[in-house]
């Protein structure tokens, strides 16, 4: 059920409204819709916007992100700021943030698409953009972390520390673990099954996403994603076609000025590295101000922790002349294991939430540095 707030802005059913400064006052996906709608409507007349850009930015981030006056000043000064988005779903974490970037919109969106550079350095072990169409060689650099190889050796449906669907378990059962090259066979299994998974998704979309059976309770990636992103129907005209395309891929019509690609990454999360496969959609609005570019990153698979995830990255202009700077807005949503129960809700989730917020601030700052360094 979707309800409205006092100003008529729809509220996503899985999120609650915050009452304290510094915490977001609107839900995740609807928040971005409101942000971009305000940017498009309020900032449209360039002469008017040029005179009141700071005021518009204050409304943008203050009213809908709940930024305090000091946070607003920090964003305008080029400091990244991130806040926690309240959620009524116990196994969901959502954070949002923004930073002003002194670069053109074109340069910033090019950085956002350069995933191999964007996801590199500390914490990132390997990132690879896939060919179009994807091929087995794209996964040549993939190797299971040593801990995962040991875990896979003993994995069974319903009892495995690596997230796998039934087809993967069927292939895993064919490995001769007594062979001296068993680890390489496990890596070959990972490469081939990853390629098959991406190709199946490209053919059948969400219906071909995994149903994880590594624990006693099967987890449907497609169902979790549909539930988490259920508010995307409320996005404004600019984003609605993108939301439909992401949910209905590959049969849904792809909006104009839209491209997509896939990539995999191996990065450190918590106690162990996580192998992930993502679908990226990039859209240029063709507008002179407001939402200029939107990048959506949909997680298709994660070897640990994450059931599903969605990242939204928006390049928002406030009417300044080209090259004088734009805002980068980022929203990260994820549904994860281990966040429920007494231990999960009281200890693990608060720590993970703080880590997600702090991580987003670092990511915003890193993207800003990359974009400004390329001027």
PLM regions: where:
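Short alpha-helical segments used as structural interaction elements across diverse proteins
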Residues: 22, 43, 295-296
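Ser/Thr/Pro/Gly-rich low-complexity linker/stalk segments immediately outside membranes or between
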Residues: 47-51
